[in-house]
Amino acid sequence: MVLNSSDLGPSRCDIRDLPAPSSTNDQGKTELARKKKVKRSNTEIEADASSSDNSCFVALVTASNLRKDALYLPQDLTSSVGLERKYREIVVTDERERRSWALDLRFNKSSDTFYISRGWRSFCDENGKKPGGVFVFKLVGNRETPVLSFCSTESINDGTQGHKNNKYNCMELKSKKKRMRCRDSTSPSQNRFMTLTLTHDNLIKSRRYLPLSFTRDNGLDKPGMIFLLGKTGRKWEANLLREASGRIVLTGKGWKEFAMANGLKSGELFTLEAILEKGTPMLSLVNTQSTNYRSQQGECSRDSEKESSICAEPSRGNKKWKATNNRKERRDSSSAIQNRYVTLTLTPEDVRACTLILPSQFMKANGINKLGKKTLLGQNRKKWFAYLLSKSGFVALGSGWKGFCEANGVKTGESFNLEYIDEQDTTPVFKFCSNSVEYVKFTSLP
């Protein structure tokens, strides 16, 4: 996308319509200062645009990000355009209306994420956006100030003028909007998901308490109606009630029917994602831990066990003791090796929700208990980032999940292996291991 430097307006986030200058000279000075600040060559901008082919994303306006006056940017997108921590400002442009806003840009070290602050609320207010509203942005990185090109959904529908590539990208993005929920930049990815345990009382009483932090961050902390979205796309109507203590409870006949229709059982973990569809809040069932993945048994594990078996001839004295001791050591080594591998099966729900669940025994065997950022390493050493959101093994991968599977030739219904690599002072890695190999031992990154 080619941006016109003349389209970039004043540099403060609270600008609306500029007052008429007192003289022609003042006007000339204002224009000169404005152009100086944002002036860049067309060649430089085109180079930036060509290097970010997949730089569009959907930004959902919520009560939470308006209250916090902050919009988080997708981590994989900011990495792809080379956004650096030194940046303290980002320019939002609307080419159609010839307006621009300069907003503060900050970096959250704990979530490794860039976010817009001190200006997001004013920007939404100026553009008439309330909770449930949607923006479509294209991020362009550059040597001076990063740019967010603003493309409203209205401009897609009415066919107003704009750069051809930008219009195509936005139209394509709109058609894939449901699949991009996981890339919604309203907050860090972990705030949209919650993993709960279904109890017998939940079903009998048709009530389930929701975590306060989850309801608050997703604007679900007020009483009202909510839809529950099942695996097949069917919806159930339920109610959110607020108790005197401030706790939010999900209740109603629809909640019980939703649980039963989707095969949820007492004692089972299930994960819900908070989404908005045409301004209506929904809780979408992502998956359940006990039904989506096979336990850790795969070709890599089985082959490693075969390789580790020892055939020792009968002997006496020290020879017999050494053979027994060696057998034990190798068996322990084999166990440690096979514990590093897990076999998973890709389901349509995984791709749609951009998530996966790691078996609990795999988590325990490798001591995986630290939440936060992880790395997925593909066959060609390409990296994708994921976030471990709970100690029960729930992992959110964002839009990179589909790309990871496509790049490594994994299709829906097929199984694949991951090897866990834990090195000091680095982000833990899950490395792709093809099912076609008999056994591959990885001790560290090459």
Curated annotation (Swiss-Prot):
Entry's localization field: Nucleus
- Native species: Arabidopsis thaliana (Mouse-ear cress)
Q: Which Pfam families match?
A: B3
Coiled coil ranges: none
Question: Which gene is this protein's source?
Answer: REM12
Q: Which InterPro entries match?
A: B3_DNA-bd, DNA-bd_pseudobarrel_sf, REM_fam
- Region Disordered: start and end of each range? 1-46, 295-334
Q: What's the protein name?
A: B3 domain-containing protein REM12
Q: Which GO terms describe its molecular function?
A: DNA binding
Q: Which residues bind DNA?
A: 56-153, 193-289, 341-435
